[in-house]
UniProtKB/Swiss-Prot annotation:
Mg(2+) binds at E25, D27, D85. It is found in: Secreted. The keyword Nucleotide-binding does not apply. The lineage of its organism: Eukaryota, Metazoa, Ecdysozoa, Arthropoda, Chelicerata. It comes from Loxosceles laeta. InterPro entries: PLC-like_Pdiesterase_TIM-brl. SUPFAM superfamilies: PLC-like phosphodiesterases (SSF51695). Gene3D superfamilies: Phosphatidylinositol (PI) phosphodiesterase. One of its GO terms (biological process) is lipid catabolic process. This is Dermonecrotic toxin LlSicTox-alphaIV2ii. It is an enzyme of class 4 (lyase). Belongs to the arthropod phospholipase D family. Class II subfamily.
Length: 276
């Protein structure tokens, strides 16, 4: 998956897809009570990027639903996966459960439109800290008595992006009600302004490939330098988050990679661990 980073304006959806992305990351900002309010990253962010682009949450989710609904004039078949980078550090932790419920309602009614036929992209809920796990728990429990529980079970995955201990990550996911390998993505990375080793990525890949692991997919963020992309691919990641999707697309065409990797399509299940 080529994961377009910090896609927070409606027009950026097509911009990043046109550059070769098949996935986007969207930053979700919340009000002080934990209700989703708008798309926004804020400073600091990445080098050579504007950090303050924003949309009202309802407007962006409406556009995102259109872009991922077959038959809609704005449908883009390339967009198969959306990572919601949930900025849950801006409100009191006591509101985490209610915030997860509110976001579940937003997805059910504004993205899925209360229908099995709208908003087909797979979703990854990405939390910045392990102690925010009640957001995931609440999101899942919202659908326990819903007729749309099948969409939760088919289309929603989970990630913690804070580069915390992976053994503890497994424990916390289980506390949130997520079983081992139940749609678990594991990210590792840092702003593109700073070089980061692949040590933790390689550890995550080893867990993914272990018979007793809990991870389905591993991704690295945020890179676009040719050497960094090559190194990440050689480490066997499943996704790369980037500001320049065309760079990753071009690297995938190189002789060293063209027979080992291909761009994921909607037929590729992001919850299945790939076996070579």
């Amino acid at each position: 998956w080529i994961m377009g980073h910090m896609v927070n304006k409606i027009e950026q959806i097509n911009e990043f897809l046109d550059l070769g992305a098949n996935s986007i990351e969207v930053d979700i900002a919340f009000d002080e009570l934990g209700y989703p309010e708008y798309t926004y990253h804020g400073v600091p962010c990445d080098c050579k990027r504007y950090c303050t682009k924003s949309e009202k949450i309802d407007d962006f989710i409406e556009a995102l639903s259109a872009a991922t609904t077959p038959g809609n004039p704005k449908f883009r078949k390339e967009l198969t996966l959306v990572v919601f980078d949930l900025k849950t550090g801006g409100f009191d932790a006591s509101r985490m459960y209610k915030s997860g419920k509110a976001f579940a309602e937003l997805i059910q009614f504004s993205y899925w439109k209360g229908s099995d036929d709208a908003g087909r992209a797979y979703i990854v809920l990405s939390l910045p800290k392990l102690d925010h796990y009640e957001f995931i728990k609440a999101f899942r429990e919202h659908f326990d008595t819903s007729t749309f529980k099948n969409l939760l079970e088919e289309r929603v995955g989970y990630d913690f992006s804070g580069n915390e201990d992976m053994g503890l990550t497994r424990v916390v996911l289980n506390k949130a009600g997520v079983n081992d390998r139940e749609h678990v993505w594991q990210g590792d990375g840092i702003t593109n302004c700073i070089l980061r080793s692949l040590d933790r990525v390689k550890a995550a890949v080893a867990i993914r490939d272990s018979a007793t692991g809990y991870i389905n997919k591993v991704y690295f963020w945020t890179i676009q330098a040719y050497s960094s992309v090559s190194d990440a691919l050689n480490a066997e990641v499943d996704g790369i988050m980037t500001n320049e999707p065309d760079v990753i697309a071009n690297v995938l065409k190189e002789d060293a990679f063209k027979d080992r990797f291909r761009l994921a399509t909607y037929r590729d299940n992001p919850w299945e661990t790939f076996k070579r």
